């Protein structure tokens, strides 16, 4: 459980850093094993990540990102950074 909390906090902080790349990418922390992001391009990001073998949950104006291993989270952050930098 401590690993999940640590990985969630790192994922949240990494996503917060990425939010500087887009005004339409608001990150919300949680006490569970996921992080919410509010964005109008959630469907496009969901498809982009799916094409890169990363699965997140698309929920209309939000996406839900489950906490993974440190390596999985790093790959996710790298893909989102690439997407936001296009």
Where are these predicted regions, by residue range?
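Conserved PLP-dependent catalytic core of the aminotransferase class-I/II
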Residues: 1-26
